[in-house]
Design a protein with these regions (language model features):
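Alpha-helical multipass membrane-protein architecture
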Residues: 2-831
């Protein structure tokens, strides 16, 4: 079964040192990949003129104060806007000080971003360098092909490894510079199309295009549709052919892209949609292309440049990970209390990091801290605090009460596990409830067992229900007026500096995205109706309503907090009730309903990245679309090759461990939700029926917090976000409370204590430290995997790799009551 998804100081710098150098005009020679409809010839280099000083404005002081009032109203409950800045806005409005109002307006709305995090890493000017070049397209497509193929192949292996976009961002830089050394600087004319293989030095805009292509191809992991296809082909014995596979895979990706484009006025253009993860990419782009040193007067005395610091930390992280990754694996989950009492059930339940509550969050492994949830240095402090609040309230306090009271037969089950269990305490054997045709056998189910979940897994489902209702109410209350205003104003909404700079370029039209979306929907109808999928066309209509309804609310939350809420549980829940007993329909419903929205969020994040880096929107449109379609073709081709050529692929005893873990999990989920169905798990009379109350809890609590925030707008209530409290824990399981606590401790250290005490250092180095730690870890992981795991090398055989894991917690045996052979627990009659 799938797990449910998942102070500042006064800082208005004009960044006088960053108005942009005087570059000579460069005329771009575009590489026409599609028709000229998607591209335009760039006009002559257009250096952006610095915005006039406050006193040079033509608008009256009254107009500026009115603009400030509108700004204050829109950002009154904005958790990312520093209170000091909001206080100054309020003071200017209250005193009617027009001159001060003009100064503040320019600082907050015209001259730069109102958010210090964005000001720290995103330049408030545009440099005219080419982005749509042969160099960018060739490097991007090659890396897209290699990354897609390698990731697809190794996703079939357990353990698996993946080439991430951080790796692409790193290796694309030397490849681009190497291209400059090899290719000639001359203009070519092929059938009337003119282009230059080396139109100047490899630049950061080309770099962004390459990374955007990789993000579109596999930024969210391998193509999710391949899990459905593997489950269908290998475990259910169905094969509808290559046409079905390609259309299914491409429509999943491109439906999300169409939605992302249509939603960009809500999720990309507004300054408040900061997309924190993009700030790390921006910092790394500028670091790789600019090796200048820092100004000690602005960085708490540090003069080391970002580039040099990145190399030092990245190399250090690369070398260090050999210890927790191979030499002393006990450093990962440093549960020393369990080492002292390895056979004590209560100790292992309370302090165990694998299956317990993990109330001793000490780790020396960055992969534990960032591997599941992402780097804790990225989300703003209030987001980290909300996630930790949800962990402590529900997964520690409430969960302990439930577990140690024996509710939901918890005495027979571990505190946490991503597995489902039968009434003998064993992992649920789905093959026992299927007939020879892999269809649900109710008689066999009644003779076998109902399905049971660990306490944390059950709690995670309840919180997932709460998150889905909370996000709609929260966004409606906190952002409803802004959404409606942006809808009415379309592209003519009030601009920040980055939006004004982007208006230099012709936009990708709304109707392009609309045509793409409608085309993908039409093809999807053909996919579900043209083959015997058991997926009714009317159910597909319901399926597509989910991402349409939830994309903007969930996207707003992610753009503000860096926390993504998932629709996986909701899609499983709905299809299980609508079309019970059809596993393939369940898998396809989940793929179109959940993954389309998830892909739309990844595309939106990349569109914001292009927005920050001033890449022409039409170049972003074409590069992401081409990369998505090509990547789907590559991954499906590799999948078919692997299934047909690798002996015993997807079997648990496959000699090289190509056991298809993702496809196997998807198959199990299809049986549980598509065959057993949610009615037998959550409806009246079922063990977990009480979890349905979380829908109401999720809908009610945002109203309470909103009323409190309205009454005390500058109190702690402005930072409370109930969707993040409920849904920020969506990766638990397979993540654990221990992992979340370790993540939270590091996040609070950097984004609260260091940010408040050493603000200049934090603004200059925080995001590049995050990128360096992640890059060093990823490169080290890849090297260890390819040199040691693939060669079946033996790990060092000592206590740090053996004895540290010989505890009840790691063995999954920290259980209060054990059954004798033949005994069962739970009711003998069940739904």
């Amino acid at each position: 079964m799938d797990a449910p998804d998942g102070q500042a100081r006064r800082l208005w710098p004009h960044r006088n040192g960053h108005r942009g150098p005087s570059h000579p005009a460069q005329v771009e020679q575009p590489f026409i990949m599609v028709r000229s409809l998607f591209f335009r010839k760039r006009h002559e280099a257009e250096e952006i003129t610095p915005i006039p000083g406050p006193l040079e404005s033509n608008a009256s002081g009254v107009d500026h104060l009115q603009h400030l009032q509108q700004f204050e109203k829109a950002h009154k409950l904005d958790p990312n806007l520093p209170i000091d800045e909001l206080n100054d806005v309020d003071a200017a409005i209250a005193t009617g000080n027009a001159e001060k109002g003009i100064e503040i307006e320019h600082a907050l709305m015209e001259d730069n971003s109102p958010y210090p995090e964005v000001r720290a890493v995103v330049r408030n000017y545009d440099v005219d360098v080419p982005a749509n070049t042969v160099r960018a397209w060739v490097i991007g497509l090659i890396l897209c092909t290699i990354g897609s193929g390698v990731n697809m192949l190794f996703s079939l292996r357990n353990p698996s490894v993946a080439i991430t976009t951080y790796v692409i961002q790193l290796i694309a830089y030397p490849i681009g510079r190497g291209w400059d050394l090899i290719m000639p600087d001359r203009e070519f004319n092929v059938f009337g199309l003119k282009f230059n293989l080396r139109p100047g030095k490899f630049n950061y805009k080309e770099h962004v295009v390459i990374v955007a292509m990789s993000n579109a191809a596999y930024g969210g992991g391998v193509l999710y549709a391949t899990d459905v296809l593997i489950a269908q082909k290998v475990f259910y014995g169905q094969d509808f052919g290559i046409a079905f596979q390609l259309l299914f895979g491409i429509t999943t990706l491109c439906t999300g892209y169409g939605l992302a484009g249509l939603a960009r006025r809500f999720l990309v253009w507004p300054a408040a949609m900061i997309w924190p993860a993009d700030l790390v990419n921006c910092a790394l782009f500028y670091t790789l292309h600019d090796h200048s040193i820092s100004d000690p007067s602005k960085t708490n005395g540090w003069s080391i440049g970002r580039y040099r610091l990145f190399l030092i930390i990245g190399c250090g992280a690369f070398i260090y990970y050999w210890f927790p990754g191979w030499i002393f694996r006990g450093l990962s989950v440093f549960a020393w209390v369990c080492w002292i009492a390895p056979n004590n059930v209560v100790v292992n339940k309370v302090f165990g990091g694998q299956h317990g509550y993990g109330l001793m969050p000490i780790t020396f492994d960055w992969s534990i801290i960032s591997g599941f949830i992402g780097s804790p240095l990225i989300p703003p402090f209030h987001a980290t605090a909300n996630v930790l609040g949800g962990i402590i309230i529900f997964f520690v306090c409430v969960s302990m009460g439930i577990h140690f009271s024996g509710t939901w037969f918890a005495d027979y089950l571990p505190v946490q596990s991503s597995e489902s269990y039968d009434n003998m305490g064993n992992i649920y054997n789905v093959s026992r409830i299927l007939d020879a045709n892999f269809e649900f056998n109710e008689t066999a189910y009644k003779e076998y067992s109902p399905l049971y979940l660990s306490t944390q897994f059950a709690m995670a489902y309840g919180l997932s229900f709460a998150a889905m209702s909370a996000v709609i109410i929260h966004v409606g209350l906190y952002h409803g007026k802004e959404i409606w205003r942006q809808f009415k104003m379309a592209r003519h909404q009030e601009d920040d500096v980055h939006m004004r700079l982007m208006k230099k370029y012709r936009d990708a039209e709304d109707w392009w995205y609309a045509v793409l979306f409608v085309t993908m929907v039409a093809i999807s109808f053909g996919v579900v109706a043209g083959w015997p999928t058991g997926f009714p066309a009317w159910a597909y209509v319901v399926c597509m309503m989910l991402p349409i309804i939830w994309l903007i609310p969930i996207g707003l939350i992610q753009a503000i907090t860096n926390i993504q809420l998932g629709l996986n549980v909701l899609t499983e829940f709905i299809i299980g009730y609508m079309v019970p007993g059809r596993p393939l329909a369940m898998m396809m419903f989940k793929n179109y309903g959940y993954i389309s929205m998830s892909q739309a969020l990844y595309f939106s994040q990349d569109l914001k990245l292009g927005h920050y880096m001033k890449v022409p929107p039409r170049v972003m449109f074409a590069s992401q679309l081409v990369a998505s379609i090509w990547s789907a073709m590559v991954q499906i081709g590799v999948m078919n090759w692997a299934v047909s050529k690798i002996p015993d692929v997807c079997s648990l005893d496959q000699p090289n461990n190509y056991s298809c873990p993702n496809g196997r999990v998807f198959y199990t989920a299809s049986v549980v939700w598509g065959a057993i169905g949610p009615a037998r798990i959550f409806s009246h009379g079922a063990t977990y029926a009480s979890l349905q109350w979380f829908w109401l809890v999720g809908a009610a609590t945002p109203i309470i917090t909103w009323l409190l925030a309205r009454r005390w707008p500058k109190s702690i209530w402005r930072y409370v976000c109930t969707p993040v409290i409920y849904g920020g824990t969506g990766l638990l399981p397979p993540a654990t409370v221990y992992i979340f606590l370790c993540w939270g401790v590091v996040g609070i250290t950097f984004n609260y204590f260091i940010k408040r005490r050493y603000t200049g250092w934090w603004l200059q180095y925080n995001y590049i430290v995050s990128a360096a730690l992640d890059c060093g870890l990823i490169l080290s992981t890849l090297l260890i995997f390819f040199t040691l795991y693939l060669t079946s090398a033996n790990k060092p055989n000592w206590w740090g790799n053996v004895g540290a894991f010989q505890t009840l917690d790691f063995e999954g045996k920290a259980i209060t009551r054990h059954l004798m052979p033949g005994e069962t627990f739970g009711p003998s009659v069940f739904p």
